[in-house]
């Protein structure tokens, strides 16, 4: 198993940085948040979980994020969706569990819709579908709107980045192309949603709207009343690890022998429980993802 930094060259010769843990199917794919990267605590916890349990795991940085090529302000939902699909198509095989955080929850849904034959389960953390239209635009001040109209961009202050980050006209206009909350959202696989009740960035009602829009009948919405947007406390990481372990069991290939299938699931659950999430948490949380 390896987790060394590698690069996937896209059609425009720009590179996507990624790390992979080779292991058993289904493969877990991490989709990070807006202006985040694959070194965040939750992404690292899942890498440690994969190594501990022998499961396959892929994490990557979108265009303009982390160690990938490109300028962040040139990014759009269309581009990042294409990145996610390229990573899935070129770097994985077999059944998948997509784990999406914040914007990554939106992209996970878009990827599941585009690749229904591959995606077998979703775990969504503070999912922010349609955030450009539903969460970002309504909060723009008159000054910000004027700057975007005049200059095509505005620097948004952020508690996650001292320098803030650009919000562009292209991002807002392109985001509208990929709206899904009008529903129904054609995803039929099991979905587990983890949402903080004290999240200042994605209201729990927004995440619940997504859960209610999914066509899947196997949707579990977990509200962590005192949880924030990051959900990176030890107890939050334990919930995440448990949700991913459950999703992997639900997504594993069907065996003709039901006894063998039950034994395999039990063994995988035991293996997941032998490495508590509190031990997987990185000592230095570093720049946290949304």
Put a short name on every predicted segment.
Residues 25-33:
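Short beta-strand element of the alpha/beta-hydrolase
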